[in-house]
């Protein structure tokens, strides 16, 4: 398992709260766990299009494990905490809107989870002194960003190391991108471009509080972008919608200014739903940038999750098969979206 498994204590321990009846009404039924030896959950809301259960099913089939990740589409953290007490539960992918709210209920956090302030992975450990099951939080989104660049850029020293980076957006994915660029990818300054200044201010404040916000720069105008050194790595964390409002169009012009600078680099386009082939990605490619599809981040964060849950290494997991199945699934989804 990676060094990310080193844990630090959270402020409170895993709490079990009986779900209120009105919360249970939001969930038509809990998933059937009886066919499986062990089970986990994809816990969040609006999960129908998620490829997470598919990705993990490939791993479990390859390892001959009768395991499954089941969708738990619910607003109720108490319900999830109750289900997580089952002896055959192995862990969970945690998605929106629970990535921050789940943290106070965990026993330990990995350094990445603590520093980003969001948990997308719940895994289990055993207290050696008491034998008690410990519920631990990790953030593998940062691994997804890191490995997207490491696995796909052949000359990182030339492309992005010791150069500024650019993050487009101001949500949770942007925070993970900032962390990965700062900690592992050798970024100097990290430019932030977003339509909402308050979101950028929040990212800078949170990262500063956690010790890595001093090199963050809010780029708020085309003129400012023109005067800055061009980035080597770009992470785009916004939906694939044509800009309509004045603020959205300003963001597009600022990004175009960076893309048109003489020295190019690599852009990770985090958006892959309904298609990984986005308008922004096409623009970057036209300007001579290497574009890395967002499915790479999906795959690598998922692989890291399975390392926590199964204890296996990258070499033991079917990475190429995962890539092929996800690519085929996306091609099918893209075809239906355009037809």
Curated annotation (Swiss-Prot):
Broad EC category: oxidoreductase
Catalytic activity: L-quinate + NAD(+) = 3-dehydroquinate + NADH + H(+)
Enzyme Commission numbers on file: 1.1.1.24
InterPro entries: Aminoacid_DH-like_N_sf (IPR046346), NAD(P)-bd_dom_sf (IPR036291), Shikimate_DH-bd_N (IPR013708), Shikimate_DH_fam (IPR022893)
Statement: the UniProt record of this protein carries the keyword DNA repair: no
Keywords: NAD, Oxidoreductase, Quinate metabolism
Pathways involved: Aromatic compound metabolism; 3,4-dihydroxybenzoate biosynthesis; 3-dehydroquinate from D-quinate (NAD(+) route): step 1/1
Induction: Expression is induced in the presence of quinic acid. The quinic acid (qa) gene cluster is subject to two levels of gene control: a primary system which responds to the presence of quinic acid via the qa-1S repressor protein that blocks the qa-1F activator, and a secondary system which represses transcription of qa genes in the presence of a preferred carbon source such as glucose.
GO MF annotations in UniProt: quinate 3-dehydrogenase (NAD+) activity; shikimate 3-dehydrogenase (NADP+) activity
GO BP of this protein: 3,4-dihydroxybenzoate biosynthetic process; chorismate biosynthetic process; quinate metabolic process; shikimate metabolic process
Organism domain of life: Eukaryota
Function summary: Quinate dehydrogenase; part of the qa gene cluster that mediates the catabolism of quinic acid (QA) and as such, allows the use of QA as a sole carbon source. Catalyzes the first reaction in the inducible quinic acid catabolic pathway by converting quinate into 3-dehydroquinate. The qa cluster encodes 3 inducible enymes (qa-2, qa-3 and qa-4) catalyzing the first three reactions in the catabolism of quinic acid to protocatechuic acid (also known as 3,4-Dihydroxybenzoic acid).
Descriptive protein name: Quinate dehydrogenase
Taxonomic path: Eukaryota, Fungi, Dikarya, Ascomycota, Pezizomycotina
């Amino acid at each position: 398992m990676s060094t990310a498994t080193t844990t630090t204590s959270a402020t409170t321990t895993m709490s079990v709260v009986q779900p209120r009846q009105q919360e249970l009404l939001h969930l038509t039924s809990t998933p059937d766990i009886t066919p499986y030896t062990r089970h986990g959950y994809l816990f969040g809301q609006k999960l129908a299009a998620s490829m997470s259960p598919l990705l993990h099913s490939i791993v479990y089939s390859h390892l001959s494990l009768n395991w499954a990740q089941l969708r738990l589409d619910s607003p109720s953290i108490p319900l999830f905490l109750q289900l997580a007490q089952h002896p055959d539960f192995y862990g969970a992918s945690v998605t929106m809107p629970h990535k921050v709210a789940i943290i106070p209920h965990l026993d330990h956090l990995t350094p990445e989870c603590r520093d980003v302030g969001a948990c997308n992975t719940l895994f289990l450990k055993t207290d050696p002194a008491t034998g008690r099951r410990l519920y631990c939080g990790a953030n593998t989104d940062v691994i997804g960003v890191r490995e997207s660049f490491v696995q796909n850029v052949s000359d990182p020293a030339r492309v992005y190391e010791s150069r500024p980076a650019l993050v487009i957006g101001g949500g949770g994915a942007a925070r993970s991108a900032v962390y990965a660029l700062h900690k592992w990818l050798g970024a100097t300054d990290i430019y932030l471009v977003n339509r909402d200044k308050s979101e950028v201010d929040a990212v800078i404040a949170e990262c500063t509080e956690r010790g890595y916000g001093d090199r963050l720069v809010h780029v708020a105008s085309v003129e400012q972008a023109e005067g800055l050194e061009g980035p080597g790595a770009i992470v785009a964390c916004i939906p694939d919608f044509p800009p309509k409002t004045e603020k959205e169009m300003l963001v597009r012009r600022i990004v175009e200014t960076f893309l048109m600078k003489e020295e190019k680099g690599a852009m990770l386009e985090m958006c892959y739903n309904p298609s990984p082939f986005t308008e922004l990605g096409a623009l970057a490619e036209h300007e001579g940038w290497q574009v890395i599809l967002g499915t790479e981040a999906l795959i690598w964060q998922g692989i890291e999750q399975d390392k926590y849950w199964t204890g296996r290494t990258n070499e033991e997991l079917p990475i190429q098969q995962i890539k092929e199945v996800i690519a085929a699934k996306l091609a099918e989804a893209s075809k239906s979206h355009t037809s």
